[in-house]
């Protein structure tokens, strides 16, 4: 009877969670017992146990209380024969090897002289302890850690997808570093799809296909970047299909990175799409404001540079969609201050960070006027304390666009809106960023105002 109640809990969770979330985390979880309000579950391994505790315990608890009809406390244990222990997971080193031996990391095929043009070895900066985890990347980071610790088991392949400059390559190479740190003898191969294709063409021309296959199919861990570029390349897809199968059958871990999920890669063979989707697809999205600030703070610490909080907020508010651009902006700011001798302040750094180098920006009044026009409110209402929905929405959008289109710091933007606190401005920016991906009406209104102000042409995001 109690087990039947757990099945009802699972059924309810299946209705309320996405299919990937349910299939990955809830379905493999086993019922152990329920007594005196204590619900005990068994996770297949330590990673799943930690993930359930951190991300689903409250959801499971609330659902179980509805089914069991009483207060419930959820306990998650690890299956007795699980090969991965919590102790190993938490204490394993994550630092990169100081030097990789020539045979340990293969990133070009140079050992077989297939390519004259080679890719670099794993970037020493791309390790787990230099990756800032936020809501945008938590699942991908956790999956990458799980794969690095226990390759070839649960998530094979691991398919990491997301836009340009969001950390896919960082996570992918961090997996390689981790494996080499705990197993220096591991055969780790990092390759771009372009290099795979070029090596294939060269092998065909030189009649060295067996050498090509031996090299790519010998890896314990293969990391393939930009797999979306395989689209339309029929012979490359054919060869990669057989390479994939050989590696998977041998228990080797496969990690793929793409700017889109498999289902959105055009002219991709159905069988490859199926293979790419058979493990775990983890997406990395643009970081929110707090995560961007944390990224800047961490990079500043690595560079041993002290930054005032308002400058961190300013840069984080100006570069919203690409971590490379965000870190690049900080690098330019540090170099600019070092060369000119100017202090690291918003006033001294802001003009230098104009993406087009033109120093052209909209004025606060222009932003207020255009936002008021589109939202059918007045600038005075936006500066007031009114909490009417149309006014509060317009105010938030105004703060967001003023941050994008002007050089004003958060406190100064707050002053423009009637003396609002800088934390109110931060919250407004955060809310608009969320709504841009979930509320088509807000997205349309924001784009209309951008067009009216020509913010896009003046300031690329």
Curated annotation (Swiss-Prot):
InterPro entries: AAA+_ATPase, Chromosome_initiator_DnaA, Chromosome_initiator_DnaA-like, Chromosome_initiator_DnaA_CS, DnaA_C, DnaA_dom, DnaA_N_dom, DnaA_N_sf. SMART domains: AAA, Bac_DnaA_C. ATP binds at residues 165, 167-169. It is found in: Cytoplasm. It comes from the Bacteria. One of its GO terms (biological process) is regulation of DNA replication. NCBIfam families: DnaA. Oligomerizes as a right-handed, spiral filament on DNA at oriC. Plays an essential role in the initiation and regulation of chromosomal replication. ATP-DnaA binds to the origin of replication (oriC) to initiate formation of the DNA replication initiation complex once per cell cycle. Binds the DnaA box (a 9 base pair repeat at the origin) and separates the double-stranded (ds)DNA. Forms a right-handed helical filament on oriC DNA; dsDNA binds to the exterior of the filament while single-stranded (ss)DNA is stabiized in the filament's interior. Isolated domain IV (residues 363-461) binds both E.coli and B.subtilis oriC. This is Chromosomal replication initiator protein DnaA. It comes from Prochlorococcus marinus (strain SARG / CCMP1375 / SS120).
């Amino acid at each position: 009877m109690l087990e039947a109640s757990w099945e009802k809990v699972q059924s309810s969770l299946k209705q309320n969670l996405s299919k990937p979330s349910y299939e990955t985390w809830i379905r493999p979880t086993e019922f152990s017992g329920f007594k005196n309000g204590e619900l005990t579950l068994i996770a297949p391994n330590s990673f799943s146990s930690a993930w359930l505790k951190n991300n689903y315990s409250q959801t499971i608890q609330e659902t179980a209380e509805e089914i069991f009809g009483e207060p419930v406390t959820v306990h998650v244990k690890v299956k007795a024969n699980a090969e991965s222990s919590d102790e190993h997971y938490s204490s394993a080193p994550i630092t990169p090897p100081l030097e990789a031996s020539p045979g340990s990391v293969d990133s070009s095929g140079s050992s077989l002289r297939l390519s004259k043009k080679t890719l670099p070895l794993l970037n020493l900066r791309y390790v787990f302890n230099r990756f800032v985890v936020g809501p945008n990347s938590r699942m991908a980071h956790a999956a990458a850690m799980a794969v690095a610790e226990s390759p070839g088991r649960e998530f094979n392949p691991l398919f990491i997808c997301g836009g340009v400059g969001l950390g896919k390559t960082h996570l992918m190479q961090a997996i390689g570093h981790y494996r080499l740190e705990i197993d220096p003898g591991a055969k780790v191969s990092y390759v771009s799809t372009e290099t795979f294709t070029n090596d294939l063409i060269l092998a065909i021309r030189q009649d060295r296909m067996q050498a090509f296959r031996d090299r790519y199919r010998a890896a314990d861990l293969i990391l393939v970047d930009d797999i979306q570029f395989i689209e339309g390349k029929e012979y490359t897809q054919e060869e990669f299909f057989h390479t994939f199968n050989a590696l998977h059958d041998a228990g080797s871990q496969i990690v793929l990175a793409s700017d889109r999920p498999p289902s959105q890669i055009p002219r991709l063979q159905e069988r490859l799409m199926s293979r790419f989707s058979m493990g775990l697809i983890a997406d990395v999205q643009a970081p929110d404001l707090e995560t961007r600030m944390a990224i800047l703070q961490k990079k500043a610490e690595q560079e041993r540079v002290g930054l005032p909080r308002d400058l961190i907020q300013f840069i984080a508010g100006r570069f919203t969609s690409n971590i490379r651009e965000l870190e690049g902006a900080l690098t330019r700011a540090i170099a600019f201050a070092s060369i000119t001798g100017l202090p690291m302040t918003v006033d001294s750094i802001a003009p230098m960070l104009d993406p087009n180098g033109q120093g052209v920006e909209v004025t606060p009044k222009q932003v207020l006027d255009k936002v008021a026009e589109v939202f059918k409110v007045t600038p005075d209402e936006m500066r007031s304390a009114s909490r009417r929905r149309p006014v509060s929405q317009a105010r938030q959008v105004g703060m967001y666009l003023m941050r994008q289109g002007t050089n004003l710091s958060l406190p100064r933007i707050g002053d423009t809106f009637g003396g609002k606190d800088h934390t109110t401005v931060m919250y407004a920016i955060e809310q608009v960023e969320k709504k841009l991906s979930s509320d088509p009406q807000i997205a349309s209104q924001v784009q209309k105002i951008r067009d009216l102000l020509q913010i896009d042409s003046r300031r690329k995001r």
